[in-house]
């Protein structure tokens, strides 16, 4: 499941839609001077764009650690959610932005947050995309290796589906177990148990 499909598309294209506010555009661009100016002029850090994304999530997904740090220093709610209920930590983990992930965790972001439509933890997104360094960091921060999302899938299942075997191996070393064959599919189960 591509949990940030609209936002990822805007990052790839390079511009946010016309209805995105200037703070959201500056966050996407990583324009720290413009972000500072807009905040000094009273821009609202809790405002969502019309796609339902707060500027903190956009900056986290884009990997702009300096913008994320500025938002947090200016009082951004670290647990602000997009319309799907995902946080900045979900976004940074999904995108593989390790520096941003570290900052968010250091500031108190919940590594086991699953209070979203998908019931996914940040570890699910990092594992799905094969971001092994992010997975390793989240595990050291006590992320639940056996957390299940709304369909019952674990981070290991998601890493295996995408054939991210280095990530899957790391998850297994951290205690993840292969799920039943009928849940994950026979080929994945065979590969998983062979590598365990």
Could you describe each region identified by the protein language model?
Residues 177-196:
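Terminal, low-structured helical/coil segments at or just beyond the last alpha-helical repeat
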Residues 19-54, 58:
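N-terminal segments that cap or nucleate solenoid repeat domains
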Residues 6-15:
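Bacterial N-terminal signal peptides
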Residues 52, 85, 118-119, 152, ...:
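Start-of-repeat signature of ankyrin repeats
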Residues 31-39, 64-72, 97-105, 131-139, ...:
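Ankyrin repeat structural motif
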Residues 25-30, 58-64, 91-97, 125-131, ...:
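Ankyrin repeat A-helix N-terminal signature
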Residues 49, 82, 115-116, 149, ...:
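Ankyrin repeat boundary/linker residues
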């Amino acid at each position: 499941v591509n949990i940030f499909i609209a936002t990822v598309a805007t990052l790839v294209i390079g511009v946010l839609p016309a209805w995105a506010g200037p703070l959201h555009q500056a966050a996407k661009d990583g324009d720290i001077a413009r972000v500072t100016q807009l905040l000094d002029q009273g821009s609202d850090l809790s405002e969502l764009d019309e796609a339902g994304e707060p500027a903190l999530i956009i900056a986290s997904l884009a990997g702009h650690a300096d913008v994320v740090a500025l938002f947090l220093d200016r009082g951004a709610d670290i647990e602000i959610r997009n319309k799907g209920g995902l946080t900045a930590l979900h976004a940074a983990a999904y995108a593989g932005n390790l520096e941003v992930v570290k900052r968010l965790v250091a500031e108190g972001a919940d590594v086991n947050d699953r209070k979203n439509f998908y019931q996914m933890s940040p570890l699910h997104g990092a594992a799905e995309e094969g971001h092994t360094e992010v997975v390793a960091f989240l595990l050291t921060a006590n992320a639940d290796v056996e957390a299940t999302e709304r369909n019952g899938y674990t981070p290991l299942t998601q890493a295996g589906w995408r054939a991210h075997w280095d990530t899957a191996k790391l998850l297994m070393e951290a205690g993840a177990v292969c799920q039943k064959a009928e849940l994950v599919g026979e080929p994945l189960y065979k590969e998983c148990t062979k590598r365990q």
